[in-house]
Amino acid sequence: MHELSIAHSLVEIAEEAAAKAGVARVTVVHLRLGTLSGVVRDALLFGFDVASAGTRLEGARLEIEEVPLQVYCETCDTVVALPDVRYFRCPQCGAACRRIVTGQEIELAALEYEDDTPEATAS
């Protein structure tokens, strides 16, 4: 289950970013996950809960945006979404497509956090 190691890396990256920003607690982690990433969503959610235990991300929600598979069709000279990831053929002209544009990413997009500074709680 490589999702657990991905979750550990995600927590480590988010911890570093939160520490740099002086954040005490992260509440939401936004992740972009491509169709072809090979990551099982439910396993990643479970792994995130395990990996975040005892960190400033403990109890944080992992929001996953699924990124569809898009390829570049040289014949049509355009980017097209593939409805079936098993066939890398342009749905418009039927030509084989070799260049993937989106759909492979595992990207930490944003963090949401609680601001515990006295200035933030006073207003």
From Swiss-Prot:
It comes from the Bacteria. Ni(2+) binds at residue 2. It holds the Pfam family HypA. The keyword Ribonucleoprotein does not apply. InterPro entries: HypA/HybF (IPR000688). Keywords: Metal-binding, Nickel, Zinc. GO terms for biological process: protein maturation; protein modification process. Gene3D superfamilies: 3.30.2320.80. Zn(2+) binds at residues 73, 76, 90, 93. GO terms for molecular function: nickel cation binding; zinc ion binding. Belongs to the HypA/HybF family. NCBIfam families: hypA. Involved in the maturation of [NiFe] hydrogenases. Required for nickel insertion into the metal center of the hydrogenase. This is Hydrogenase maturation factor HypA. It comes from Roseiflexus sp. (strain RS-1). The gene is hypA.
